[in-house]
Amino acid sequence: KDALVYGQMNEPPGARMRVGLKDGSITSIQAV
């Protein structure tokens, strides 16, 4: 999941949120 969080940092907020919700980890979005 750490790799996902780092990967999300390169994505726009919208994509980041969708990936976070799809993965079911809201905390990863808040961490970013």
Swiss-Prot record:
Induction: The 56 kDa isoform is constitutively expressed. The 54 kDa isoform increases 9-fold during 10 hours of high light stress and decreases after 24 hours of photoinhibitory treatment. One of its GO terms (biological process) is ATP biosynthetic process. Produces ATP from ADP in the presence of a proton gradient across the membrane. The catalytic sites are hosted primarily by the beta subunits. It is an enzyme of class 7 (translocase). Disulfide bonds: none annotated. Its main location: plastid. Its EC number is 7.1.2.2. GO terms for cellular component: chloroplast thylakoid membrane; proton-transporting ATP synthase complex. This is ATP synthase subunit beta, chloroplastic. One of its GO terms (molecular function) is ATP binding. It comes from Brassica campestris (Field mustard). It catalyses: ATP + H2O + 4 H(+)(in) = ADP + phosphate + 5 H(+)(out). It is a peripheral membrane protein. It is found in: Plastid, Chloroplast thylakoid membrane.
